[in-house]
Amino acid sequence: MEFKEILRRRRSVRKYLSRPVEREVLDTVLREALAAPSSRNSHSTHLRVVTDPETIARIARMRDYGSAFLEHAPAVVLVEGDRTATDLWRENAAITATALLFAATDAGLASCWVHVNGRPCLKDQPDGAQVPFCLFLPLL
């Protein structure tokens, strides 16, 4: 797909089909996302794929609002920034996440950026508790 077409087609989707994402497709999307540029070529971003429905359901409940729709996604990619690699780890993670969204679109997958850095945890957590830096990108 042409890049301009990817830009036109890219949108946030919050309802997903229940069919699993093929491993080969996931591997391609991840490989393409990890080719994204990073500060000083530090590659300080790590991607973790979750396909276990119980784990995805727990991830969906990590926040009081704004992430419940994750529960029905067949796959979730956690975008994690390594704060020891560079002071620009957040920026690197955002660049990689954006590349991941575009790669998913190119592969015919739906996705949605769910940002949780510094967002409140569940109500039963201690006051001031926050979710550590992580982006959740459900894919289908």
For every predicted segment, state its role.
Residues 1-140:
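Acidic, surface-exposed loops and disordered segments
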